[in-house]
């Protein structure tokens, strides 16, 4: 098993959705089926109807995430927790709409980010191996998630 970032990744991950939206002609949605099935289905329907390229990015835990409480039988619940903690934002961007091109479907984070990542063994392994580094990286990841959400809200206002 390859563990490319077993010691933690110090830089922020790329934001594929923002990159695609910057083109201005790509339908983009970020979904989490376990958090909101209706939003997931709406995104699929809109993407299929869109005359142009569409990109749907879904949050889907896998066995390697190592969900501590209940394992993969709780993956739908884990998807909902990711959204509530602000780890994953749900939205739809439709460039053909005149108003409200960007719809944010997930609300403000309402759950503890650190508690969410503590429930996944992939993060717990880092905390066991490099506790100080893990604490620092987890705090940076939470801050990055907050910044992503704030940037998304600002983009939403631009597209009103």
Q: Which role does the model predict for each range below?
A:
Residues 1-107:
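Glycine-rich ThDP/TPP pyrophosphate-binding loop and its adjacent helix/strand module
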Residues 60-160:
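Flexible, low-complexity linker and terminal segments
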